[in-house]
């Protein structure tokens, strides 16, 4: 899940197809050759995934819930969120039980984890109290720096 808490408005919107399954709020990479998206296996994760709600089938008559659009299979169009330093997001793609406010974050396996060495682009800022009850943590995009 992803919530855009403090972001720069009117950024260009990039909609791309996934080459593998991704989760909403996950750090992603864009393949420059075929312009597809996959979760960040190991790196900075400076781009985030957002999955737009679709109002087809049952969702045409019943308002879908947030969790109805948590996962995107391969070949699904997703919105690529280009993050900028200073922006704040809330995401479910981290383990809030193992992190403390101020921890530096890297992307590994499509999730945010504590950076112990190497470069990082995010800081953990604590738990986000989402009105839907989804367990989320606040992250702030920072200038790229080296941990350790």
Residue ranges and their predicted role:
Residues 1-148:
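Surface-exposed, low-hydrophobicity beta-strand/loop segments enriched in small/polar/acidic residues
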